[in-house]
Every structure is written in C-alpha cells, then in structure tokens.
UniProtKB/Swiss-Prot annotation:
It comes from Chlamydia pneumoniae (Chlamydophila pneumoniae). This is Probable aromatic amino acid hydroxylase. InterPro entries: ArAA_hydroxylase, ArAA_hydroxylase_Fe/CU_BS, ArAA_hydroxylase_sf, Aro-AA_hydroxylase_C_sf, Aromatic-AA_hydroxylase_C. It holds the Pfam family Biopterin_H. One of its GO terms (molecular function) is phenylalanine 4-monooxygenase activity.
Length: 362
C-alpha cells in the first residue's frame, strides 16, 4: 500500500490516533479535560467506521484527520517548552507522531513546479543533496528521510506545526534540534507561502545541512543566542533586558533572513540561489533572477540594520562568493556581540518578528 493511501486507511488512522492518545496522556496527565476532549472524537470515529454508510465513513475520516492535526499541533507546542533533558527522556515515538498526513499527488505537483527552476538557478550540488535525502522522488518516504537526516547531519529532526518564534527556534538549534514543519502548502499557495511549511523546511533548508558550512552556521547561531541570553540575564532592570534582547535578536534574525533564507552565491557556476525562501517559492526564485532586483555583496554591518518584508518578493538580495562566508559571518557577529555593538540596532517596526521573546526577560 502506498504511503498516501495508507494515511487514509481507517486502521492506520486509528493506529496514529491511539499513539497520539498515549502521548497526550503522558504529557497532559493532569489535564482530564484535554484527555476527555480527545477521547470523545476518537471513540466516535471508531464507532462510525463500523457502519456501512460510506458517506458517513468518509466524513468521519476527514473529521478525524482534522482532530489529529489539532492534537499533533498541541503536542508540538508542549514539546517546544521542554528542556533538552526532558525531550531526550520523552518516551513518545515521535517518528510516528511527526508523520504528516501525506498527499502524494500534491507533493508531486509541488515538486514538479520547482524542479526546472532549481536546475537553472541553484548550485548543482543542491540537487545532489536533494537526491541523497530521497527528496526528488514523487513518493516521500518520511521515515527514511528522518533516519538519513539524523545519521548524516549534526541535528535531530524536530517536527513543529508551522512558524516557530525566533527565540524558540534558536533555543532548539542550540540543543541540536532542527525544527521542520509538518504541514504542507496547498496548490493555491504554491507560488508563495507566508509561513514556513514542509516545502520550505524540508526542501529549502534540510538538504543544505549536508554542507559543513551550513551546519556550522546553524550551530553557531544557536550558540550565540545562548550568549545573548546570558548577557541579558545579567542586566539589572527588565527594561534594559527587553531592549538589549530585542536589539541583539533582530540582528540575528536579519542575519538569517539575508543568508539562509534569501541568500545568493556567485561562483564558477554564475549567480545561484541557496536561500530557503527563494528555493521553496517559484515566484520568489523567478523574481530574483528575472526581475530587476538589487544584488549586493554580503556585508554584516549592512544587513543587521536593514529591515525586510516576508510578505512580498524581495527587492534587495545579498550575495556571497563561497559558503565559508556563512561561518565567517557568525564569527564577526559574535565579535560584535562581545563588544556590545548589537545593543542599539534599529527595529524599524519589525517587533512582530520577535513574538513571545518577553518571557526571557522576566
């Protein structure tokens, strides 16, 4: 049975539902209301499947999938709040729980709309990395991808429901967890997705982790975040802590945005794209090479002071000459952090990209 067919099979749905119920019992043992809320639709679905009415079965199946996605998201949010030791001590089978309800036809169509653009506008070895992960197949073997990911990269696969606030994202990187969205965009969002999804994370970020400079970049950024927190916690007033954390964090976020999210590289192959926002979006990728976009050499002092807009195609992009520049960038950023040079970075009304960080300033 194909994977996409299996996810619609009643017995398989019940298996995942049972696994989720066990997980929720483990994590929310003190919340009887949550357990009751889950048990009711689970029991309802099991009863409906015994009926002969195919229409009711189909309706119940889709209802159950929605319920499962809701509780998966609830579980992911809870996991984000755990410490590293708590996550490692978790007995939940996350390989099963993290599996998305996969639509093979949708995956194939989303992949097909990007492949010719990747051949034209991405470095050759990016396609090699995709192939190594098995991501160029019209059938995504999610468990094989997770296994290869954890064997060949410096990170553990960490499923999330979508957007992760920067302070949570960096905290996960520091603990060597790589957040990967479990939801996939629909065809009407093919060209441009406002929020990170499976296409953005799995196709735009994950393949690059086979390159040592990318792995080191992500690891270093997580480590720098820890230094920022230590620095902030030593400040006497909450107002100082908030201002300092905001300023340092927006500098880190902009470094991410203008490199691994929207970055270009110019080498012997010519100008190519490596940023996940470009790679995952046919509209963004085409815009970067066909339209009149300003491309500048990557300069740390410039990018940490430059605001960006995630909701429209980019008008200014930055280019590197080799991927070692990503590691060099983190070294320069750390020096600026140590010298106190990141404490007066203008926000330009970009506070929305720092949502939830105040919990670190208590």
């Amino acid at each position: 049975m194909h994977y996409c067919e299996r996810t619609l099979d009643p017995k398989y749905i019940l298996k995942i539902a049972l696994k989720l119920r066990q997980s929720l019992s483990l994590f929310f043992q003190n919340s009887q209301s949550l357990q009751r809320a889950y048990s009711t639709p689970y029991s309802y679905y099991r009863i409906i499947l015994q009926k002969e009415n195919k229409e009711k079965q189909a309706l119940a199946r889709h209802k159950c999938i929605s319920i499962l996605e809701f509780f998966k998201n609830l579980l992911f949010v809870h996991l984000l709040s755990l410490s590293k030791n708590q996550r490692e001590g978790c007995s939940t089978d996350m390989a099963v729980v993290s599996t998305p309800f996969f639509n093979r036809n949708l995956w194939y169509r989303l992949l097909s709309s990007r492949f010719s653009l990747w051949k034209s506008y991405c470095p050759r070895f990016f396609l090699d990395y995709l192939e190594a992960f098995g991501l160029l197949s019209d059938f995504l073997d999610h468990q094989a991808v997770i296994k290869f990911f954890e064997l060949e990269t410096h990170f553990s696969y960490y499923p999330v429901s979508g957007f992760v606030a920067p302070h949570q994202y960096l905290s996960l990187l520091q603990d060597r967890y790589f957040p990967i969205a479990s939801v996939m965009r629909t065809l009407d969002k093919d060209n441009f997705s406002l929020t990170p999804d499976l296409i953005h994370d799995l196709l735009g970020h994950v393949p690059w982790l086979l390159h040592p400079s990318f792995s080191e970049f992500f690891i270093n950024m997580g480590r720098l975040f820890t230094k920022v927190i230590e620095k902030v916690q030593a400040l006497p007033s909450k107002k100082q802590r908030i201002q300092t954390l905001q300023s340092n964090l927006i500098a880190i976020v902009r470094c991410f945005w203008f490199t691994v999210e929207s970055g270009l590289i110019e080498n012997h192959e010519g100008r190519k794209a490596y940023g996940a926002v470009l790679i995952s979006s046919p509209q963004e990728l085409g815009h970067a090479f066909i339209d009149n976009v300003r491309v500048l050499p990557l300069e740390l002092d410039q990018i940490i002071r430059l605001p960006f807009n995630t909701s429209t195609p980019q008008e200014t992009l930055f280019s590197i000459r080799h991927f070692d520049e990503l590691v060099e960038l983190t070294s320069k950023l750390e020096w600026m952090l140590d010298q106190g040079l990141l404490e007066s970075i203008p926000l330009y009304n970009q506070e929305k990209y720092l949502s939830g960080f105040e919990v670190l300033c208590q």
